[in-house]
Curated annotation (Swiss-Prot):
It comes from Sus scrofa. A lipid is attached at residues 524, 1397 (S-palmitoyl cysteine). The gene is CFTR. This is Cystic fibrosis transmembrane conductance regulator. The modification Phosphothreonine is found at residue 717. It is found in: Apical cell membrane; Early endosome membrane; Cell membrane; Recycling endosome membrane. Residues 423-646, 1212-1445 form the ABC transporter domain. Residues 81-365, 860-1156 form the ABC transmembrane type-1 domain. Belongs to the ABC transporter superfamily. ABCC family. CFTR transporter (TC 3.A.1.202) subfamily. Residues 99-122, 217-222, 320-339, 881-919, 1013-1014, 1118-1131 are extracellular.
Length: 1482
C-alpha cells in the first residue's frame, strides 16, 4: 500500500478532492492492484475507533442500569455530525434564495420596470454566486456524514466481533449464523448509506417553513393548496411503498425457496450429475422462479408508479398553487416562474428528503437497538484456576447446557430439602428434574494425576465433548467442583484450520522452538505430507484448509495442540479421519511417547487406546457408567460394549440430525401432554411436545436468555426412563446382536421420533452458531468444502474471497509472539490473496455486452424503438408550438403593454404564450414520466429478459463439466443466482427506465433552450463533450475501486466465520487478542478501498457540478445580454436551465449506475458461455406404453445388439485410466488398469488421500479422463454421459438430500408409483422411518434432511440405486459416521438387493471388507496391487501393514467359518467386544 496524498494535501485540495487525482490517473491508464491503494489515516483505523467506542460503551455500562448504545455513539461522533448538518442546511438555504433572484431578473425585463433593467446583470452575478456557494458547501456536507457513518460502522463492527469472541456457548446456541452476519452487513451498512440523509429530518421542516413563507408573500393562502397536494402525494407514495414491501416480503419467501434449492444443487453438483438429475433440478428451480417472477413484476409495477408520481407531480403543484390566486386576483408572469422554482425545491423536500430521512432514522435506531441488545448478552466466564495444581479433579459435577435449568435444579433441590421428604419420596426431585430437561452431565467424579492418560468413551450423545467443554470452562457446572491448573491445550473433534501457513497453524502464536516443532511434526506423521509441497510448511492454506484432505487437517489440529506446552491436553476424538496404520503410529509416537509426562484426556472408542490408558471413564446418558482401569472394566462391566457402542439405546439424533448439539441434548425424555414446573412466583415454564421445525425461529438475534423456549422431546425406552440398570431383562444375545433378521430389521433400526407438521422453507430452523462449531466431520470436510487436487471451491454465507487477506495477516505472525503483526502488506501476498477473485471482466462494460443484452429478447428492441418514437412525437409537438409562438409574437406586440397593465387579469399576451408553451412542456414531461405506453412495457420486457438469462445460466451450470466447475467457488456460483439475478430483477429495469427518462428530459429541455437562444447551443456542445469524457475517465477507476472494495469485504465475514468455527480452540489457547488484531487488519484494508471510492466519487460529482455551474453562468449571461423587452424568454431559459442542472447530474449518475449494474449482466453471460459436457450421438430410450421413459435403457451401439438391455451383468474393464480434476492440472490417477467380473465385489484400499474417491469419480466421468472403461462390452466413448452414469448406483461420502418431499428425493422425475417406492423403502429399511412423519412420502425435508440421521440418508441413497436398477454400485466409505445398527442394515440390504450386482467399495473399516472377493490397493495415484485377500495377506503390502494380526485372522476364510461355532455368553461378549470396538469410530 502507498502513503496517502491526503496527509500532505492543502485545504483547497481537500475541499475540491484534488488529492485523488493520482489514483484516478493510474486507474484510467492501467488496472489497479491492491498495492496501489492508499493507507488509511490513524483516525479511520479500526484499533482507534473501536477503542474509542468501547471506552464510551464501558462507561455507559458502568454508570447506568439501562445503558444505551446511542449515548456512547453520541459522545463519540455527535459534534462532527452536527457540524456537517449545519453546512448542509446552509447549502439548502441557497436553493430557497435562488428563485427570489430569478424573479427579480424576470421582473427587470418587464416594460414597466425599465429602471431595474440596469441591475439585471448584477442579479445574474448573484444567482451564479449562489450556485457556486452551494457547490462548495454541498459536497463536503455530503462527504462528511458518509465518512462519519463509515467510522461508526467500523467501530461497531469491531465491538460486535469482540463481543462474539466473549459470548458464552449457551448464547451462541441461540444465535443463528444468518442473524449474526445480517447484524454485521445489512444493519451496519445503513450507516454508510443513509447517514447523509439523516439531517433532513430537521432540515426539511425548516426548509418547508421558509419556502411556505416566501410563497405566502407571492400567492398568499393559495400556496397551501400546492403544499396540501404534496402531503397527499407523500401519503400516496407511502401507501405504494407499503404495498411494494408487501410484495417484496412475499417474494422474499419465494426467493429463499429458490436459493435453498439452488445452493443445495451447487453444493452437491457432483451428486446431481452422478444421479443424472440435471433436468429434474432445472425444472424444479424454474417452477419456483415462475412464482417468484409474478411477485417481482407486481413489485416493479408499484415502484414504477411511485417513481413516475414524483415527476408528474410538479405540474399539478404549480397549477394548484397558481390557479386559485390567478382566478381571484390575476397574476404576473414573474410570480409564475418564481413559484415554479419554489415548487421544485418544495416537492423535493416533502416527497423525497423528509420521508428518506425518517426511514433512515427508523432503520438506524432499529439497528442500534439490535446491536445494543447483542452487546449485553451473557459472556463466557473464565474459571478460577490454581497454577500450582498438578492433578485434575472433578467432584460430583452436574451441568446443563440450557442456562435456566441450572437455577431450576437448585430451586427444586431446595424445595425437596425444605419439605424433608422421606426416602420413599426421593423420586419427587428426580421427577421434577426430568421435567426440567436432562442434564448433559450428571454426578461426574474422577481424579487423574500428572502424567496419566484418561480415556473417555461412550456412545453418541453420551456427553464426552461436554465433559471437555466443562473442563475448559465453556460449560458451567450447576453443582460440583473442578480443579486443575488452567494451562490447557485442546484438539477439537472437528479439525479447525485458520487461514495461514501450516507452520503458523501449528505454532499458533506460541514461541517458536525448532526442536519441539520438528518433534511434533514427526510424531504427528506430517513430514511426508509437508515434503510434497513446494513451499514445505510455508504453504498458505485457505480458510478451513480446503486444499488438504480430512486426515491432513486432523493431524495439523493435533500438532497444534501438542506443540503448546500445557499441563493438561484435551483430545476430542482426534483420529476420526485417519486410516488405521496412521492412527496407530500417531497414538504410539505422539500420545504415548511424546506426551508421556503430560496429563492427557483422550476421547476415543478404540479398544487398544483403552488398554493403554491409565484410567478409563465410560459415559452413558451423561452419567458415569464406569471409572477405573481396563482390568477393572473387564471384571466389573462385562457388558460395557453395549454402552460404548450404544447398541441397546442408541440415540438416533446424531450430529447431522441436530440443528444444535446443545438443544438436542435436552430432547431425551418424553412427556405426555403438557407439564409445568415452578419458575418463580409469577412465571411458568411450559414444556410442550412441539416439532423441531414446526415453528420458525424468530429472525431477530435478540433471543432473551431467560425467555421461554419450546423444544422437542424424544421418546425413550423404559430402560432410559428408569435410570441406568445393569440388566435390562433381555437375553444377552439379543442385546448384542448386530445383524437383525430380515423380518425384524426395521423394528431394530432406530426410529426418528420427531412428530410435526411437514416443515416448509420458511419454517426451517436456522443453523446456530454453536452448530457451526460442532458440525460433524462429514459436513465440515465435505458439505461446505470439497477438496480437489489443483483447485479449490468454497461455499460461504457472505461475498466470497479465496485465500483472503487473513492468509496474509496470518503470515505476519512473529516468530516470538503472535501479537506483533507488521503494518506492511506485501504486494506479492496481496496478489496471492486475491488471484482467484479478480474477475476477467473489463473495467467498463463493453458495447458488446449492451448489444447482447438488448438482443436477448426481440421484444426489447421494439419497446426501445417505441420509446424513441414517443419522445420524437413529443419533441415535434414542442417545436410546432414554438414555431407558432414565434410567428404570433410580432402581431401581439402592441397588446403586450396593455395586457401587462391589467394587474387583475391573467396575462394573455405573446409573453404569456411562452408561459403556455412552458406549461405544455411541463405536461410533456409529465406524460414522459407517466407514459404507461412507454414505461410499463419497458419494465415488463426487462424482467422477461432477466427470466431468460436465469434459465440459460441455470442450464449452462447444470451442463458444465466438473473440470470447469472445479475452478469456480460454490459461493461465486451462488452469487450469480442470488446477487446478480436480484440486480437483473430489481435494480436494472428501473435504473434503465430512469436513465432513459432523464436523458430524454434533458435532451428535450436543451432543444427548447437552444431554439429560443441558438447561442446557448454553442455552449451546450462542449458541456456534453466534457460530461462524456469525464464519465469515461471516472468509470475506469471507480469500477475497479468498487471491485476491490467488494473483494475487501469478503475477508471480514470470512474471518468472522473462521473465528466462530474455532472459537473453543481460540479460547483454549488464549488467542482472542491476536484474532481481534487480524479482524482489525481486514477492516482497515476494506476501509482503505471504501474511503478511496467515496472520495473519488465525490471528486466526480463535484466536477460535474462545476461544469454545470460554468454552463449555467454562460446561459445566464447569454440570456440577459441578448434578450430584449418581454420577460417570457428569459424566464423559460433560466427556469429550464436550473431544472437541467439537477436532471443532467441525475442522468449522469444513472448512467454510471447502469454501467455498474451491467457488470452483473457480464458475469451472467460469462456463466452462460461455459462449455457443456460432451454429448455423444447414438442415444435413444425405449418409450413405455404410457409414453414415459422406460425403466430400462436401450443402447444403439455397434458393440451391442439392437434392443439389448444394458448393462446386463456389470462387467467392467479399465484400460490405462488417467484422471485430472482440472484442465492442465496434475494427474491424480495414472495408468490405472484392471477388470472386474460380473457380480464381483471389489474393495479399494489405500491411505488417506491416495485417490480411492477420485477413482470412483473417474468411473462416473466426473473428471478429465484419458483411457477407456467398458461396461459389458460398451465403451464410455460410444454412449452419452447420461446413459453411462445411469448404469451406476452411487452412495457417496456426502449424501445429497435436497429440500423437498421424500417422494421427490427418491424419484425426482416421477417415474415410479407409490407402490414401487414403498416396496423399495421396505427393502432398504426406510418404510418405518417414513411412515412416522406426517404426510409420509409427502413430508417435506429441509436443511439437507436434518431430521434424518446420517444412516437414514445413506439408506435414501441405497433406495435410489435400487429404484434405478443399477448393475454397478459405487460406495465411498458408507460406514463413516454411522451407528452400528444402521450400518448392519446397509450390509443386509447390499446382500439382498444387490446380490447379483457388481459392487466397488472404498472403506477404512476392516469389517466392511469381509465380503469383498478382491482388493485394489492404490498408492501414490497408481495401482500397486490387485488380488485376492489371501494373496495380499501372504506378502508384504500396504494392506498387511494396515491391519492388526487379529484382523488378519478375521479376514481369512477358515476364521470366518470357525466363528460360527457355539460359545459361552461371556466368551462371546469378550471376543465380540474386541472385534467391534476395535474398528468403530464415534
Amino acid at each position: 500500500m502507498q502513503r496517502s496524498p491526503l496527509e500532505k494535501a492543502s485545504i483547497f485540495s481537500k475541499l475540491f478532492f484534488s488529492w485523488t487525482r493520482p489514483i484516478l490517473r493510474k486507474g484510467y491508464r492501467q488496472r489497479l492492484e491492491l498495492s496501489d491503494i492508499y493507507h488509511i489515516s490513524s483516525s479511520d483505523s479500526a484499533d482507534n475507533l473501536s477503542e474509542k467506542l468501547e471506552r464510551e460503551w464501558d462507561r455507559e455500562l458502568a454508570s447506568k442500569k439501562n445503558p444505551k448504545l446511542i449515548n456512547a455513539l453520541r459522545r463519540c461522533f455527535f459534534w462532527r455530525f452536527m457540524f456537517y448538518g449545519i453546512i448542509l442546511y446552509l447549502g439548502e438555504v441557497t436553493k430557497a434564495v435562488q428563485p427570489l433572484l430569478l424573479g427579480r431578473i424576470i421582473a427587470s425585463y418587464d416594460p414597466d420596470n425599465k429602471a431595474e433593467r440596469s441591475i439585471a446583470i448584477y442579479l445574474g452575478v448573484g444567482l451564479c454566486l449562489l450556485f457556486i456557494v452551494r457547490t462548495l458547501l454541498l459536497h463536503p456536507a455530503i462527504f462528511g456524514p458518509h465518512h462519519i457513518g463509515m467510522q461508526m460502522r467500523i467501530a461497531m463492527f469491531s465491538l460486535i466481533y469482540k463481543k462474539t469472541l466473549k459470548l458464552s456457548s449457551r448464547v451462541l446456541d441461540k444465535i443463528s449464523i444468518g442473524q449474526l452476519v445480517s447484524l454485521l452487513s445489512n444493519n451496519l451498512n445503513k450507516f454508510d448509506e443513509g447517514l447523509a440523509l439523516a439531517h433532513f429530518v430537521w432540515i426539511a421542516p425548516l426548509q418547508v417553513t421558509l419556502l411556505m413563507g416566501l410563497l405566502w408573500e407571492l400567492l398568499q393562502a393559495s400556496a397551501f393548496c400546492g403544499l396540501a397536494f404534496l402531503v397527499v402525494l407523500a401519503l400516496f407514495q407511502a401507501g405504494l411503498g407499503k404495498m411494494m414491501m408487501k410484495y417484496r416480503d412475499q417474494r422474499a419467501g419465494k426467493i429463499n425457496e429458490r436459493l435453498v434449492i439452488t445452493s443445495e444443487m451447487i453444493e452437491n453438483i457432483q451428486s446431481v450429475k452422478a444421479y443424472c438429475w440435471e433436468e429434474a433440478m432445472e425444472k424444479m428451480i424454474e417452477n419456483l422462479r415462475q412464482t417468484e417472477l409474478k411477485l417481482t413484476r407486481k413489485a416493479a409495477y408499484v415502484r414504477y408508479f411511485n417513481s413516475s408520481a414524483f415527476f408528474f407531480s410538479g405540474l399539478f403543484v404549480v397549477f394548484l398553487s397558481v390557479l386559485p390566486y390567478a382566478l381571484l386576483k390575476g397574476i404576473m408572469l414573474r410570480k409564475i416562474f418564481t413559484t415554479i422554482s419554489f415548487c421544485i425545491v418544495l416537492r423535493m423536500a416533502v416527497t423525497r428528503q423528509f420521508p428518506w430521512a425518517v426511514q433512515t432514522w427508523y432503520d438506524s435506531l432499529g439497528a442500534i437497538n439490535k446491536i445494543q441488545d447483542f452487546l449485553q448478552k451473557q459472556e463466557y466466564k473464565t474459571l478460577e484456576y490454581n497454577l500450582t495444581t498438578t492433578e485434575v479433579v472433578m467432584e460430583n459435577v452436574t451441568a446443563f447446557w440450557e442456562e435456566g435449568f441450572g437455577k431450576l435444579f437448585e430451586k427444586a433441590k431446595q424445595n425437596n430439602n425444605s419439605r424433608k421428604i422421606s426416602n420413599g419420596d426421593n423420586s419427587l426431585f428426580f421427577s421434577n428434574f426430568s421435567l426440567l430437561g436432562t442434564p448433559v452431565l450428571k454426578d461426574i467424579s474422577f481424579k487423574i494425576e500428572r502424567g496419566q492418560l484418561l480415556a473417555v468413551a461412550g456412545s453418541t450423545g453420551a456427553g464426552k465433548t461436554s465433559l471437555l467443554m466443562m473442563i475448559m470452562g465453556e460449560l458451567e457446572p450447576s453443582e460440583g467442583k473442578i480443579k486443575h491448573s488452567g494451562r490447557i491445550s485442546f484438539c477439537s473433534q472437528f479439525s479447525w484450520i485458520m487461514p495461514g501457513t501450516i507452520k503458523e497453524n501449528i505454532i499458533f502464536g506460541v514461541s517458536y522452538d525448532e526442536y519441539r516443532y520438528r518433534s511434533v511434526i514427526k510424531a504427528c506423521q506430517l513430514e511426508e505430507d509437508i515434503s510434497k509441497f513446494a513451499e514445505k510448511d510455508n504453504i498458505v492454506l485457505g480458510e478451513g484448509g480446503i486444499t488438504l484432505s480430512g486426515g491432513q487437517r486432523a493431524r495439523i489440529s493435533l500438532a497444534r495442540a501438542v506443540y503448546k506446552d500445557a499441563d493438561l491436553y484435551l483430545l476430542d476424538s482426534p483420529f476420526g479421519y485417519l486410516d488405521v496404520l496412521t492412527e496407530k503410529e500417531i497414538f504410539e509416537s505422539c500420545v504415548c511417547k511424546l506426551m508421556a509426562n503430560k496429563t492427557r484426556i483422550l476421547v476415543t472408542s478404540k479398544m487398544e487406546h483403552l488398554k493403554k490408558a491409565d484410567k478409563i471413564l465410560i459415559l452413558h446418558e451423561g452419567s458415569s457408567y464406569f471409572y477405573g482401569t481396563f482390568s477393572e472394566l473387564q471384571s466389573q462391566r462385562p457388558d460395557f460394549s453395549s454402552k460404548l457402542m450404544g447398541y441397546d439405546t442408541f440415540d438416533q439424533f446424531t450430529a447431522e440430525r441436530r440443528n444444535s448439539i446443545i438443544t438436542e441434548t435436552l430432547r431425551r425424555f418424553s412427556l405426555e401432554g403438557d407439564a409445568s414446573v415452578s419458575w418463580n412466583e409469577t412465571k411458568k415454564q411450559s414444556f410442550k411436545q412441539t416439532g423441531e421445525f414446526g415453528e420458525k425461529r424468530k429472525n431477530s438475534i435478540l433471543n432473551s436468555i431467560n425467555s421461554i423456549r419450546k423444544f422437542s422431546i424424544v421418546q425413550k425406552t423404559p430402560l432410559q426412563m428408569n435410570g441406568f440398570e445393569e440388566d435390562s431383562g433381555e437375553p444377552l444375545e439379543r442385546r448384542l446382536s448386530l445383524v437383525p433378521d430380515s423380518e425384524h430389521g426395521e423394528a431394530i433400526l432406530p426410529r426418528s421420533n420427531v412428530i410435526n407438521a411437514g416443515p416448509t422453507f420458511q419454517g426451517r430452523r436456522r443453523q446456530s452458531v454453536l452448530n457451526l462449531m460442532t458440525r460433524s466431520s462429514v459436513n465440515q470436510g465435505q458439505s461446505i468444502h470439497r477438496k480437489t487436487a489443483t483447485s479449490t471451491r468454497k461455499m460461504s454465507l457472505v461475498p466470497q474471497a479465496n485465500l483472503t487477506e487473513i492468509d496474509i495477516y496470518s503470515r505476519r505472525l512473529s516468530q516470538d509472539t503472535g501479537l506483533e503483526i507488521s503494518e506492511e502488506i506485501n504486494e506479492e501476498d496481496l496478489r496471492e490473496c486475491f488471484f482467484d477473485d479478480v474477475e476477467s471482466i473489463p473495467t467498463v462494460t463493453t458495447w458488446n455486452t449492451y448489444l447482447r443484452y438488448v438482443t436477448v429478447h426481440k421484444s426489447l428492441i421494439f419497446v426501445l424503438i417505441w420509446c424513441l418514437v414517443v419522445f420524437l412525437a413529443e419533441v415535434a409537438a414542442c417545436l410546432v408550438v414554438l414555431c407558432l409562438l414565434k410567428k404570433t409574437s410580432p402581431q401581439d406586440k402592441g397588446n403586450s403593454t396593455k395586457g401587462a397593465n391589467n394587474s387583475y387579469a391573467v396575462i394573455i399576451t405573446s409573453t404569456s404564450a411562452y408561459y403556455v408553451f412552458y406549461i405544455y412542456v411541463g405536461v410533456a414531461d409529465g406524460l414522459l414520466a407517466l407514459g404507461l405506453f412507454r414505461g410499463l412495457p419497458l419494465v415488463h420486457t426487462l424482467i422477461t429478459v432477466s427470466k431468460i438469462l436465469h434459465r440459460k445460466m441455470l442450464h449452462s451450470v447444470l451442463q458444465a463439466p466438473m473440470s470447469t466447475l472445479n475452478t469456480l467457488k460454490a459461493g461465486g456460483i451462488l452469487n450469480r443466482f442470488s446477487k446478480d439475478i436480484a440486480v437483473l430483477d430489481d435494480l436494472l429495469p428501473l435504473t434503465i427506465f430512469d436513465f432513459i427518462q432523464l436523458l430524454l428530459i434533458v435532451i428535450g429541455a436543451v432543444a427548447v433552450v437552444s431554439v429560443l437562444k441558438p447561442y446557448i447551443f454553442l455552449a451546450t456542445v462542449p458541456v456534453i463533450v466534457a460530461f462524456i469524457l469525464l464519465r469515461a475517465y471516472f468509470l475506469h477507476t471507480s469500477q475497479q475501486l468498487k471491485q476491490l472494495e467488494s473483494e475487501g469485504r469478503s475477508p471480514i465475514f470470512t474471518h468472522l466465520i473462521t473465528s466462530l468455527k474455532g472459537l473453543w480452540t481460540l479460547r483454549a489457547f488464549g488467542r482472542q487478542p491476536y484474532f481481534e488484531t487480524l479482524f482489525h487488519k481486514a477492516l482497515n484494508l476494506h476501509t482503505a478501498n471504501w474511503f478511496l471510492y467515496l472520495s473519488t466519487l465525490r471528486w466526480f460529482q463535484m466536477r460535474i457540478e462545476m461544469i454545470f455551474v460554468i454552463f449555467f453562468i454562460a446561459v445566464t449571461f447569454i440570456s440577459i445580454l441578448t434578450t430584449g423587452e418581454g420577460e417570457g424568454t428569459v424566464g423559460i431559459i433560466l427556469t429550464l436551465a436550473m431544472n437541467i442542472m439537477s436532471t443532467l447530474q441525475w442522468a449522469v449518475n444513472s448512467s454510471i449506475d447502469v454501467d455498474s449494474l451491467m457488470r452483473s449482466v457480464s458475469r451472467v453471460f460469462k456463466f452462460i458461455d461455459m462449455p457443456a459436457e460432451g454429448d455423444q450421438p447414438n442415444r435413444s430410450f425405449k418409450p413405455s406404453k404410457d409414453g414415459q421413459l422406460s425403466k430400462v435403457m436401450i443402447i444403439e451401439n455397434q458393440h451391442v445388439k439392437k434392443d439389448d438391455i444394458w448393462p446386463s451383468g456389470g462387467q467392467m474393464t479399465v484400460k490405462d485410466l488417467t484422471a485430472k480434476y482440472v484442465d492442465g492440472g496434475n494427474a491424480v490417477l495414472e495408468n490405472i488398469s484392471f477388470s472386474i467380473s460380473p457380480g464381483q465385489r471389489v474393495g479399494l484400499l489405500g491411505r488417506t488421500g491416495s485417490g480411492k474417491s477420485t477413482l470412483l469419480l473417474a468411473f462416473l466421468r466426473l473428471l478429465n479422463t484419458e483411457g477407456e472403461i467398458q461396461v459389458d462390452g460398451v465403451s464410455w466413448d460410444s454412449i452419452t454421459l447420461q446413459q453411462w452414469r445411469k448404469a451406476f448406483g452411487v452412495i457417496p461420502q456426502k449424501v445429497f438430500i435436497f429440500s423437498g418431499t421424500f417422494r421427490k428425493n427418491l424419484d425426482p422425475y416421477g417415474q415410479w408409483n407409490d407402490q414401487e417406492i414403498w416396496k423399495v423403502a421396505e427393502e432398504v429399511g426406510l418404510r418405518s422411518v417414513i411412515e412416522q412423519f406426517p404426510g409420509k412420502l409427502d413430508f417435506v425435508l429441509v436443511d439437507g434432511g436434518c431430521v434424518l440421521s446420517h444412516g437414514h440418508k445413506q439408506l435414501m441413497c441405497l433406495a435410489r440405486s435400487v429404484l434405478g436398477k443399477a448393475k454397478i454400485l459405487l460406495l465411498d466409505e458408507p460406514s463413516a459416521h454411522l451407528d452400528p445398527i444402521t450400518y448392519q442394515i446397509i450390509r443386509r440390504t447390499l446382500k439382498q438387493a444387490f446380490a447379483d450386482c457388481t459392487v466397488i467399495l472404498s472403506e477404512h473399516r476392516i469389517e466392511a471388507m469381509l465380503e469383498c472377493q478382491r482388493f485394489l490397493v492404490i498408492e501414490e495415484n497408481k495401482v500397486r496391487q490387485y488380488d485376492s485377500i489371501q494373496r495380499l495377506l501372504s506378502e508384504k503390502s500396504l494392506f498387511r501393514q494396515a491391519i492388526s494380526p487379529l484382523d488378519r485372522l478375521k479376514l481369512l476364510p477358515h476364521r470366518n467359518s470357525s466363528k460360527q461355532r457355539s460359545r459361552s455368553k461371556i466368551a462371546a461378549l469378550k471376543e465380540e467386544t474386541e472385534e467391534e470396538v476395535q474398528e468403530t469410530r464415534l
